[in-house]
């Protein structure tokens, strides 16, 4: 018979996979507090992303807490002179690198632009 993990209990050593399973039932997203991971124009081609808390749920048995305690500024590339584009600012969880980063997903200039695709796999998971 396979073991059943009960988490957390005092005096028991756990692995990261046990903590990941603990967070798995939470829904992916950003904590709904005011100004949590808020993106605002910061002048020129920069945007400011505020601090925040969120969760990613890349698979049925994994969930990870994301905590960013300070704001960051991201630089966008210069736009096409005649064709608009849509960029996305995402929190990208990268399982291979074992970290989450803020990233700009740059769209393609087009007369009818669409937002770039996001990833929702167990290895790379984007929160928009």
Name each region found by the language model.
Residues 1-59:
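N-terminal "first-domain core" detector
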Residues 4-17, 51-128:
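Beta-strand-rich solenoidal segments
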